[in-house]
Amino acid sequence: MSTNQETRGFQSEVKQLLQLMIHSLYSNKEIFLRELISNASDAADKLRFKALSNPDLYAGDGELRVCISFDSEKGTLTVSDNGIGMTREQVIDHLGTIAKSGTKEFLAALGSDQAKDSQLIGQFGVGFYSAFIVADKVTVKTRAAGEPADKGVLWESAGEGDYTVADIEKKSRGTDVILHLRDDEKEFLNEWRLRGIIGKYSDHIGLPVEMLTKEYEDEGKEIGEKWEKINKSDALWTRSKNEISDEEYKEFYKHLSHDFADPLLWAHNKVEGNQEYTSLLYVPSKAPWDLFNREHKHGLKLYVQRVFIMDDAEQFMPNYLRFMRGLIDSNDLPLNVSREILQDNKVTAALRKALTKRSLQMLEKLAKDDAEKYQQFWKEFGLVLKEGPAEDFANKEAIAKLLRFASTHNDSSEQNVSLEDYVSRMKEGQKAIYYITADSYVAARNSPHLELFNKKGIEVLLLSDRIDEWMLSYLTEFDGKPLQSITKADLDLGDLADKEAEEQKAQDESFGSFVERVKTLLGGRVKEVRLTHRLTDTPAVVSTDNDQMTTQMAKLFAAAGQPVPEVKYTFELNPEHHLVKKVAEIADEAQFADWVELLLEQAMLAERGSLENPAAFIKRINKLLG
């Protein structure tokens, strides 16, 4: 009998997610059972952990398991566990809301493309709600460990606008999820269908999955029912690598991550010696939708001596590897370990160092063995990996080898050029790795700063991700060669510079008075005015000194709401350009001023992508064209 019954409305995001999920995941509907068994496994893990400090929570029932049964007459399928259970407050929190930041933004990003919806929902992790793919009503009966029998809770919903919650009496600890199957989903009331799903998705979890099966005499006569263990229930990571198939590794990844897609690669290692631990690391094939959300949880599952301790133990991976999934099972940490203890622990630091190295080696091997697959990884996680040089000085060279860039070597915006590729193609006498940063690939590819490099056939890296400028403030060299921006006023090409130095010097002298006129006109608005011979088709550019903040870095500061120091540019004029020659000959000061201003505005527009006063620029063009 139930008491204290109330009907509550779903959080709006739950309603939207339920509708999307029912339609988008229908083609792979059997995953609901995998999700419910995974939740039951998590509940058992949490009870084991709490019972370390309070063994009485077991209350004489320490053999944890998942039980599956069905009733053909009633059309119900039940998934039960004797794990941690839930209180009334926890039921409302966990089953009536989605406690994830950015949920609204995630749902807004979903379109009408079912394949895309399915992929994104899979990344989100649907868990319990997947029951509504096959059920038109779901009933949950639960009782939290340590609570008396009269503290059971009933939750029930048809997956529409609301749900009912009430107090009930429940004799046993744990949770029963009862699915009232739709008329066209009765295939899941079949013992062999269920055996197949359990074998496919849940063979690897370290918890027995039992099913109520019919028992027969030798003559084939039914004599009753019995609970039969269906899965192997050996924790997969404790088995020898030679015994585990690729399919088992893939399904275990889906169990761990609640991802629907196969992982890109994995590494399973058992380490003995000064430290004893087993790690199973996965690289996902798709980035989670909230990878760049600051509240996004990441990290490995932590086990100590095969006992689950915590999810999302971020202390074992640096932030730039937050996309890695998997687990670590350590013999060297205490069973009562907490997040606080992990923060300042020598064992943790040693494990973090080893797991970071292992992860980078996985990526290095992938890049070497399968460039196409590595490009798939780079498109999903390249931006995150670019955070590495700033975070991890010890592994900076290893990270640098994994970075990929667009380049003038290819007529493509695809980031597929490594620094090793670049160095192998450097010109004789070239001492630096040259790059340019811009708001977009198109802006970088068409920058006037490239003109001399194109003329001389010198490769330039084209960087257009917002993080690039910040990354390069930490990644200043590779293989002993400095990385140098081609937009700097004091750029020195060394042995690659033009040989016509005498001719250029004479030309510069003939333009001396012109340069002085421009300096007088512009005054303190620019740092310096000078002639340049690194342009071929463009009359003028602006550039910054080595000790100055670059344009892209200034934009990065502004976007982050940080104060931006004033950037004073060097104004460089091309004495070989017909327009500069024409302006140098203008005697009328007003007309001269208009043309110089126009040249400066053009250069600023090419460098920054915008002007402080675009109306004045347009007015000036109209005036000079009229």
Swiss-Prot record:
It is found in: Cytoplasm. Signal peptide: none annotated. The keyword Mitochondrion does not apply. PROSITE patterns: HSP90. InterPro entries: HATPase_C_sf (IPR036890), Heat_shock_protein_90_CS (IPR019805), HSP90_C (IPR037196), Hsp90_fam (IPR001404), Hsp90_N (IPR020575), Ribosomal_Su5_D2-typ_SF (IPR020568). One of its GO terms (cellular component) is cytoplasm. SMART domains: HATPase_c. Residues 556-626 are annotated as: C. This is Chaperone protein HtpG. It comes from Aggregatibacter actinomycetemcomitans (Actinobacillus actinomycetemcomitans). The lineage of its organism: Bacteria, Pseudomonadati, Pseudomonadota, Gammaproteobacteria, Pasteurellales. The gene is htpG.
